[in-house]
């Protein structure tokens, strides 16, 4: 059991939550405006009107996302080793450095767009490369899950972090759209850059301070921080050793070591049966959970590419697209608020997570089909419902954290990071290709893939619901 001093020296949950909220909010303020910046850069590069860069924008944005997650997939083993042998905070720091380069390169490209129009591809792909190599995405998610185990936080830590990401994804684009009505694109980048930098300098240094103090107390007391399960197993075996076995041991005259000893044979068979039943009920759902996690990661890029659908196919303005994105994330905020409330009162159980995931994926299948018939008037309402139903991130990440064994968590964090990066790496090019095909032929081709993914996810969630 962790000592009282060690518990006091753990990084404050409020500190981590506040830092993560401000960090994600400042970065997501440019989630839609970066599409406008890419449009401007490509229009300058090809010397064509901005309305004619639609197909080039979809190809470049898909290629940049593909590059980012390809690099993120390659560096997963490196960051997994760092997380295991050094500290999870290293990935948090490198991710911040990658985001800082995003702000730096974007600001310079706006300032010198007319002087260096040929640098469009360098700016776009260098940002994608450095965001990927810095650990943004899969490696960062694995780091937060490792922090949960490192400081003995409960699984609700993962649920709250994923909920905060959705909250910031709602607040950020909404603030960005409002500010863009009053300030220029350059000023918006400078404002978000300043918030992002100051937030890290203040909060993360405090977190590192608490982390070092916690680790020093743990080392002094000889506590294996990441191997607490071994201590629990020792205590479990001690509790399940009956007094009769201790009483009979002197009378057996050393026969306990013999395989013919009925006492030792009975105990061995009993523990073997207990472990077999435990493993069967605990580890068997893990493949289904990981399959649901993979399908959820496949679905993630859909609405990001749908923003391009709104810009190019539906001919909506950047302010309208930003507003619709905010409405979608507001729906996600509603769902995550319910998850946070249930987590706070202790009602967000594993069964509740499974049920939420099943209902969410089933409803999302229907809404994606209806999105094909959406108009400019009905799209905000559909975006709201899509945000409500598709926000199963806290549930799926909570299930992964709940079902992963505690004895060797790094193996599973590495595997889930590889799954997430692989899914996004596969999904982006196929959905982008479907979007390009829909520009030339039929718009419904863009919606077929996400509908099939949601159907498979619904079936997997239904199978998972039958296991404890």
UniProtKB/Swiss-Prot annotation:
InterPro entries: MFS_trans_sf. GO terms for molecular function: transmembrane transporter activity. Disulfide bonds: none annotated. It is found in: Membrane. Keywords: Meiosis, Membrane, Transmembrane, Transmembrane helix. GO terms for cellular component: plasma membrane. One of its GO terms (biological process) is meiotic cell cycle. It comes from the Eukaryota. It is a multi-pass membrane protein. The chain crosses the membrane at residues 13-33, 59-79, 92-112, 116-136, 158-178, 190-210, 285-305, 330-350, 356-376, 382-402, 417-437, 446-466. Has a role in meiosis. This is Meiotically up-regulated gene 111 protein.
């Amino acid at each position: 059991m962790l000592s009282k001093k060690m518990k006091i020296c753990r990084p404050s949950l409020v500190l981590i939550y506040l830092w993560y909220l401000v960090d994600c909010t400042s970065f997501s303020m440019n989630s839609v405006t970066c599409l406008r910046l890419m449009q401007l850069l490509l229009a300058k590069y090809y010397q064509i009107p901005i309305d004619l860069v639609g197909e080039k924008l979809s190809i470049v944005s898909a290629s940049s996302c593909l590059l980012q997650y390809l690099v993120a997939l390659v560096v997963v083993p490196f960051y997994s080793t760092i997380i295991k042998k050094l500290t999870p905070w290293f990935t948090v720091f490198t991710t911040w450095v990658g985001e800082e380069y995003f702000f730096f390169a974007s600001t310079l490209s706006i300032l010198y767009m007319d002087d260096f129009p040929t640098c469009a591809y360098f700016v776009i792909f260098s940002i994608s490369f450095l965001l990927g190599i810095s650990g943004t995405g899969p490696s960062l998610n694995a780091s937060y899950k490792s922090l949960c185990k490192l400081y003995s936080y409960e699984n609700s830590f993962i649920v709250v972090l994923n909920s905060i990401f959705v909250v910031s994804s709602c607040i950020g684009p909404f603030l960005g759209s409002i500010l863009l009505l009053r300030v220029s694109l350059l000023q918006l980048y400078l404002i978000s850059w300043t918030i992002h930098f100051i937030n890290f300098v203040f909060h993360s240094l405090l977190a590192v301070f608490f982390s070092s103090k916690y680790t020093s107390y743990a080392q002094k007391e000889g506590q294996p921080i990441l191997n607490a399960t071994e201590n629990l197993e020792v205590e479990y075996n001690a509790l399940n050793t009956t007094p009769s076995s201790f009483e009979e041991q002197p009378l057996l005259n050393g026969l306990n070591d013999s395989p013919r000893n009925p006492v030792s044979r009975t105990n061995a068979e009993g523990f073997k049966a207990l472990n077999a039943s435990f493993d069967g009920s605990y580890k068997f759902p893990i493949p289904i959970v990981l399959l649901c996690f993979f399908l959820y990661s496949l679905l993630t890029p859909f609405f990001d590419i749908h923003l391009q659908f709104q810009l190019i196919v539906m001919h909506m303005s950047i302010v309208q697209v930003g507003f619709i994105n905010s409405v979608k994330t507001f729906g996600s905020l509603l769902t995550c608020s319910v998850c946070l409330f249930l987590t706070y009162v202790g009602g967000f159980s594993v069964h509740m997570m499974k049920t939420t995931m099943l209902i969410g994926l089933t409803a999302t299948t229907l809404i994606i089909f209806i999105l094909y018939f959406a108009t400019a008037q009905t799209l905000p309402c559909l975006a709201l419902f899509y945000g409500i139903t598709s926000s199963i991130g806290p549930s799926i990440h909570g299930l992964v954290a709940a079902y992963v064994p505690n004895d060797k968590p790094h193996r599973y964090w590495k595997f889930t990071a590889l799954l997430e990066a692989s899914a996004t790496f596969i999904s982006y090019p196929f959905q982008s290709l479907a979007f390009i095909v829909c520009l030339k032929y039929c718009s419904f081709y863009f919606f077929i893939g996400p509908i099939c993914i949601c159907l498979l996810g619904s079936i997997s969630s239904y199978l998972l619901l039958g296991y404890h």
